[in-house]
Amino acid sequence: MSTGTPSETAKAQASASANAPSFESIGIKNKDIVQKSGVSLSDQQKVLVGSVLDLFEGNPTLKHLSLWSKTATFQDNITIAEGYDKFAAQWYGLPALFDPIRIQSHTVTSAGNPIEFKLKNTYTVKGVKSEQTMESTVQIEVGADGKIAKVSDKWDNELPEGAFSQALRKLNAVTVPTLVKVPKTEEEDQKMKAEREKRTQ
């Protein structure tokens, strides 16, 4: 019979939700999550979507990647990056090759597992100033621990030839983890973030 005292499980859940990642604790920029009529994300799902939108906009940080399982996978039409070293290199490689990256629109179409949203993103290839807008369907699979297990980016259209596709293929090469600098410490991460933000001002 219940005595009115919270069970250990309830206490653990309350403690977990108190310590749950938030827009503020992760430093998420994309806080205004657009949901299709009838779709209702939980606060935790909104944090995951906002963090992934930040990554697609070229704003990776170690805190953003702390929301991912170490064994997670990132997949798009031309690459599969399995494990932390590979998917971290993908996200840190994006702003190294494209600047600026601007999200034109996004709409969450499913609050299930996977969470699904439509994304329209404009990439400008660094140095070449070649601009390309891509539309895709993004799925975020969440593991039992609440961390991201997989992100799939399925493009609606074929990859156009030219500077954009060359840059993307470079990003998706197997050599990326050895070429792209992924910060090891919070201090290093903050320094890289400050340099990125200085460029976009």
Residue ranges and their predicted role:
Residues 2-58, 143-201:
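Terminal "cap-and-tail" regions of soluble proteins that handle hydrophobic small molecules
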Residues 62-115:
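A solvent-exposed, acidic/Ser-Thr-rich amphipathic alpha-helical stretch
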Residues 108-114, 141-149:
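A short, structured loop/turn motif at beta-sheet edges
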Residues 118-124:
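Generic short beta-strand segments
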Residues 130-138:
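Short, surface-exposed coil-to-beta transition loops
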